[in-house]
């Protein structure tokens, strides 16, 4: 129902979702015919709640904005996080003055009044493979971003609703005093959040090994809390009722502290219902109990399954339920078979379309360590650090040692395969067939057929992704910068022109933009290496993420204009990779020739240090279409190209993001392109593309597409279907 109301974007998706809903309701009525009226009422409630949550309330700018100290972060005199404007949750950001930080450190809620603000709709993903933050925040009932330019702080008295947020903030500061790895596990287990970017490498390691669910996603630690309280109650000779009440009260508090994290709520609801059925002496199967947990969770949160963590948490528990009679190894295989289709779709924010075929082995080895060492030790540290701070001298070496071991194994990439992205229909097909394979009786012939179907499906999908029938030229939307992917069909060759990147003006290093945009874009297509990367010039918006690229994906050759190696800034980016990648300096007249594609260099004519006027300029032909790329080359350079080459092209990437310093009218007249492309950022401070350039295009009747408006722009060609141009953001074909 959540999918029908909130996620389905095509008739096919609505049809499949309705079909599953009908089957689900039919099974419920078949099993519980006497309760058909209750089932109908439940469906009515869920439908109503879904539509209520879909409704958008109008923001009343000017009303006070309420901010809780545990929901915002301050960095480099800048704050960002979540706030509430009347009944609407919003993302907020602004400059953090001294009075703001002072009030924030008091833990209680603060009100912002008399403010000036700019309200924006949260942008959806504008690149294939990119995580969609618009959908993510919609699952948290957040649709708007409020950028504060000025504000005043209005003091208010503490209310009962403030206490949970105050306790969360207190625990955040409490954990902040712990060493890095102890802090990491304590925050994940209690608050269901990672407090620091310093632990990004460890999270990536858990992801690559396929054991990310061991953290807060699965809610495994709830059973440890319950066992701890029961043991304490037994030691204190409390009655069963008193122990149950303590468990329920503790779990409710922890649900609030975890900010209603789906895995924790799921595990807690399971305990609540178990207690209820036991006290009422109602016999119910574990499968039916899981169904009741799901339904009650959905009533509580109709947007539940917009959350990837919720999908994985329930899928894991469902897998445990249908494989409860299997051995440990076979059960691990079942769990990974169910989770894999989800991880290859774009539901999951940190997976990037890669799977590890040794995940079963890693789970078999690491789960016992996690359950019997990490979880109990975290539990002990959390509750004893306040009175025995020296305990971290014991815990930190253990946590660090296990983290180092995890990072070491992950760095080896044993079993890790970049599979690529599958679509929603393929995901459903794989899940359904896998479930039937698991739950059907032992019909050997039927099971053999189902196994063959699953294996055949995965193999077919893999080959279609890795040996595509079409090639492409894709202008990746990296904001104010350039990054263009070029691939050939079948025995695919992959080339990148520039990497994109941003200047870092803050004190702290930010995660490279490449990790959020370019790598997911590549991995979604199953691209795990690049045959060559062409570097136009030294600017950060063109090659700022080069080091991050070389650190994470194999590159065979780096092509650049001769003289760039004399630039120390450039050499810093490639130091440490000189043994792994071949450097190829180029000048006008040089040719980079491969079996399927040849790049001709038309600029520069002399070595330089990589300034705009030294931009490497390339032309090549794909499917009888001539392309030209000139980096940030100015008009003087364009005239030099005119003087040496009589170029006419079909497609041209406009120089310098559409700046008036490039795109000379005479140059464009000579090129006579049927379409030009502009790569520029939204609301960029340079005003690109300049109106003068757009007027030139209009005067010459040259149409254009801009990543600023269209997101990633992809030109595809195929021997079977000809050529097409698609724009990802608008989703249309031109």
Predicted regions mapped to residue ranges:
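Membrane-interface helix/helix-cap signal primarily in integral membrane proteins
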Residues: 45-213, 516-525, 529, 563-566, ...
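Aromatic-rich juxtamembrane segments at the membrane interface
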Residues: 143-270, 275-276, 532, 599, ...
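Alpha-helical transmembrane segments of multi-pass integral membrane proteins
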Residues: 321-419, 674-679
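Short hydrophobic/aromatic residue motifs in ordered secondary structure
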Residues: 80, 123-125, 221, 262, ...
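N-terminal leader/targeting segments
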Residues: 1-61, 173, 266, 443-446, ...
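Non-globular, low-confidence helical/coil segments that flank catalytic cores
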Residues: 109, 113-116, 159, 200, ...
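Hydrophobic alpha-helical transmembrane segments
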Residues: 157-166, 184-197, 256-263, 281-288, ...
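Hydrophobic alpha-helical transmembrane segments in multi-pass membrane proteins
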Residues: 12-15, 25, 32-39, 202-360, ...
């Amino acid at each position: 129902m959540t999918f029908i109301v909130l996620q389905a974007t095509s008739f096919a998706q609505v049809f499949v979702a309705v079909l599953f809903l009908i089957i689900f309701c039919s099974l419920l009525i078949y099993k519980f015919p006497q309760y058909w009226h209750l089932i109908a009422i439940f469906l009515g409630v869920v439908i109503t709640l879904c539509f209520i949550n879909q409704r958008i309330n109008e923001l009343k700018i000017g009303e006070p904005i309420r901010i809780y100290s545990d929901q915002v972060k301050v960095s480099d005199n800048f704050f960002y996080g979540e706030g509430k404007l009347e009944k609407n949750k919003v993302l907020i950001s602004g400059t953090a003055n001294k009075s703001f930080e002072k009030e924030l450190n008091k833990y209680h809620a603060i009100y912002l009044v008399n403010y000036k603000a700019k309200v924006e709709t949260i942008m959806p993903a504008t690149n294939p493979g990119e995580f969609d933050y618009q959908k993510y925040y919609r699952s948290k009932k957040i649709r708007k971003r409020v950028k504060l330019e000025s504000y005043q702080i209005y003091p208010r008295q503490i209310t009962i609703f403030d206490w949970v947020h105050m306790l969360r903030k207190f625990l955040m500061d409490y954990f902040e005093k712990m060493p890095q790895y102890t802090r990491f596990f304590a925050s994940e287990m209690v608050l269901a959040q990672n407090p620091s970017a310093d632990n990004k490498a460890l999270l990536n390691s858990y992801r690559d090994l396929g054991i990310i669910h061991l953290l807060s996603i699965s809610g495994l630690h709830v059973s440890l809390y319950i066992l701890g309280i029961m043991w304490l109650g037994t030691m204190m000779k409390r009655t069963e009722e008193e122990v149950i009440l303590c468990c329920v009260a503790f779990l409710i508090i922890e649900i609030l502290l975890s900010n209603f994290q789906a895995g924790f709520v799921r595990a807690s609801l399971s305990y609540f219902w178990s207690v209820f059925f036991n006290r009422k002496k109602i016999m119910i199967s574990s499968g039916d109990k899981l169904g009741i947990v799901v339904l009650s969770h959905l009533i509580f949160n109709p947007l539940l399954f917009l959350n990837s963590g919720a999908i994985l948490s329930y899928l894991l528990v469902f897998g445990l339920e249908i494989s409860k009679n299997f051995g440990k190894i076979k059960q691990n295989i079942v769990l990974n078979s169910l989770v894999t289709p989800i991880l290859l779709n774009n539901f999951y924010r940190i997976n990037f379309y890669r799977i590890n075929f040794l995940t079963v082995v890693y789970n078999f080895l690491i789960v016992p360590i996690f359950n019997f060492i990490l979880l109990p030790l975290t539990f002990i540290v959390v509750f004893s650090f306040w009175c025995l701070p020296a305990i971290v001298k014991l815990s930190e070496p253990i946590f660090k040692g296990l983290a180092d071991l995890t990072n070491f194994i992950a760095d080896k990439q044993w079993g890790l395969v970049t599979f690529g992205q599958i679509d929603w229909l393929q995901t459903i097909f794989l899940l359904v067939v896998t479930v039937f394979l698991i739950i059907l009786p032992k019909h050997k012939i039927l099971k053999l057929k189902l196994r063959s179907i699953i294996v055949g499906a995965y193999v077919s999908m893999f080959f279609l992704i890795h040996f595509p029938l079409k090639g492409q030229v894709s202008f990746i939307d990296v904001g104010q910068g350039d990054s263009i992917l070029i691939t050939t069909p079948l025995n695919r060759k992959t080339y990148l022109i520039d990497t994109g990147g941003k200047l870092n003006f803050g004190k702290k290093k930010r995660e490279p933009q490449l990790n959020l945009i370019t790598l997911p874009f590549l991995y979604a297509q199953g691209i795990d290496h690049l045959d060559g990367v062409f570097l136009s010039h030294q600017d950060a918006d063109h090659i700022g993420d080069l080091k991050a690229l070389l650190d994470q994906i194999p590159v065979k050759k780096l092509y650049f204009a001769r003289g760039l190696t004399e630039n120390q800034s450039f050499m810093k980016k490639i130091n440490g990779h000189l043994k792994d990648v071949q450097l190829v300096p180029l000048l006008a007249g040089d040719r980079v020739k491969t079996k399927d594609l040849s790049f001709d260099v038309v600029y520069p004519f002399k070595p330089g240090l990589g300034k705009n006027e030294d931009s490497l300029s390339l032309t090549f032909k794909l499917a009888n279409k001539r392309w030209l790329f000139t980096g940030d080359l100015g008009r003087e350079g364009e005239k030099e190209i005119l003087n040496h080459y009589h170029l006419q092209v079909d497609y041209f990437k406009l120089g310098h993001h559409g700046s008036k310093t490039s795109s000379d009218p005479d140059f464009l007249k000579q090129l006579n392109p049927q379409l030009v492309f502009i790569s520029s950022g939204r609301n960029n401070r340079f005003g690109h593309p300049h109106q003068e350039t757009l007027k030139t295009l209009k005067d010459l009747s040259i149409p254009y597409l801009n990543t600023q408006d269209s997101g990633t722009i992809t030109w595809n060609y195929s021997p079977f279907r000809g050529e097409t141009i698609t724009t990802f953001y608008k989703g249309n074909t031109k």
